[in-house]
Amino acid sequence: MRKMMPMNPKQLKKLMKQLDMRQLEGVKEVIIKMEDREIIIKEPIVTVIKAMGEKMYQIAGGSEEEKAIINISEEDIKLVMEQAGVDYETAKKALEETGGDLAEAILRLTDSGVE
């Protein structure tokens, strides 16, 4: 098996130019959305590779967080608003924090004294 020789930065830069590769600067996070969850990659290294008229994005490094997507209906938000006497954003946040559980969201809001 051949051992790969390390490349110096100048050679690497030349190779990246030949392959039409470049690194995106200032990327804070990448979110991959799936039907039931999201994967959030913080502080990733993102490289764009152009080949045959297409762009490919390579994502590396960073810390990864996975969270479930909760679909909250407008009716649920309105119900929590009415029952707990709170504004739209407060009701929505409570539902998100409780995984969409209406009763739990209302109880949390009324027990905490939020008006």
UniProtKB/Swiss-Prot annotation:
Residues 6-72 form the NAC-A/B domain. Contacts the emerging nascent chain on the ribosome. Pfam families: NAC, UBA_HYPK. Homodimer. Interacts with the ribosome. Binds ribosomal RNA. Belongs to the NAC-alpha family. Coiled coil: none annotated. This is Nascent polypeptide-associated complex protein. CDD domains: UBA_AeNAC. It comes from Pyrococcus horikoshii (strain ATCC 700860 / DSM 12428 / JCM 9974 / NBRC 100139 / OT-3). One of its GO terms (molecular function) is RNA binding. InterPro entries: NAC-like_UBA, NAC_A/B_dom_sf, NAC_arc, Nas_poly-pep-assoc_cplx_dom, UBA-like_sf.
